[in-house]
């Protein structure tokens, strides 16, 4: 069968891996240093997905710090804690390993595009799937606009040698669906 698609691009958190435990754990450790929190995983579900700065802003607001008194101070604290514990209770969703290994068998390229800081995105993917499993992993970097801007997705397609029309984009949020659309890719989610 002639496959129309050459490349599968995945969001990381909430799509490939269940990271809500890690995000909640690291956020609460950070909040605790300022005498705030803790937040529940249910609360965190509504807070994450738009990068760590937005996550901290919303977390502080959820704890009553709406004037962002601790916002500047908490960012480096969170980054340090997250660097250590970004893979806390991290595991892939059911069926993901099967899906990605099947894709590899068929000769498709697989990529990850995430709003998670680049170093942690790479670290998490390597921790869960092993080194070199994905053809490319792109996290949030200086100078690359965050999703729903399509820059990351388009960069991944280019690295994988695929035209956007030959890419399937998998995600779990509205942000992801917009990203795929903006990149002119077929979205799944």
Q: Where are each of the predicted segments found?
A:
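Active-site neighborhood of HAD-like aspartate-dependent phosphohydrolases
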Residues: 2-46, 53
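A metal-dependent, Asp-based hydrolase signature
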Residues: 49-84, 94, 102
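Substrate-recognition "cap/lid" segment bordering the active-site pocket of phosphatases
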Residues: 88-91, 117-185
